[in-house]
Structure formats: structure tokens, C-alpha cells
């Protein structure tokens, strides 16, 4: 670039005279509502339609976590092959949602679920297997039976 042009551009940026600080660049803070408005305007351009009656949306990741939307707003544009899901999202483990999510799982997820099921009993057995030291400690907490209470109740009945 030409040095003269560069000097002109620098002179335009100065606010005061020679030796003063240059103006600060204005920082524009974006808010979530501004992003949401921009997203909604982009979706309007795609001519999306609202899909009613959807109670929940689950997106299953490869690592076994699930992105769960409860009562989301779902919009679709079939011509653009675009679906927009908006609402409060929660990230959960697949095992937390197991009873209700089984009907939604595909073949890939079912194989990963089988692997989880094979690992789960091993973990439970490892955690619940009582050690000999633990058994002795549990016996100390329970008092020994000294008398026979059945005989006392039979004597009262006679």
C-alpha cells in the first residue's frame, strides 16, 4: 500500500490533534434475543412451517449422551430439507432415559446399548460384592439374640 494513503487513513482515525490517543473501536455486544431474531428471519426466508403436537425431541450422540428437548417448538422446510428445533435443551446420559427411549433407538444405538448392558452388570457386581472385612463389620452392628421370645408369648397365651 502507498505510504501517503496509509498516512491519510491514519489521520482520519485520530480524534484530537497530533499526539492524542486514537478513538476506541466500538464493541457491539450481541444478545441472545438479537441472535434469535436473526435466526427467525432466516427461517422465514426458508418458508418454514410449524409442526404441532411434538412432546419431546431426543438427539442421540455417538458417545452415548442424549440432547433432550421437552415440549420444543419444531419448524420444518421440506423444500430446503431443514428442521429447526427450539426450546430448553438438557444433556443426559442414555442410561437415564432408558425405559422411554427404547422405541426411538435405531440399529446403531441398539448395539451401543447392548455394550452398555454388558458393562452394567459387571459394574454392579464389582460394587456390590461384599468383602470378608465388610461382613464382620456388619455382624458387629446386630446384637446377639439372648432369649427365646416365642416361648414367652406361648406362656402368656396359656
Curated annotation (Swiss-Prot):
Q: Where is the NAC-A/B domain?
A: 33-98
Recorded superkingdom: Eukaryota
- Identify the Pfam families for this entry: NAC
**Stretches with biased composition (Acidic residues):** 134-150
Xref: InterPro entries: BTF3, NAC_A/B_dom_sf, Nas_poly-pep-assoc_cplx_dom
Looking at the record, which segments are called Disordered?
A: 125-158
- Assigned protein family: Belongs to the NAC-beta family.
Q: Which PANTHER family match?
A: TRANSCRIPTION FACTOR BTF3 FAMILY MEMBER
Q: What is this protein called?
A: Transcription factor BTF3 homolog 4
Q: Where does this protein come from, organism-wise?
A: Danio rerio (Zebrafish)
Q: Lineage of the source organism?
A: Eukaryota, Metazoa, Chordata, Craniata, Vertebrata
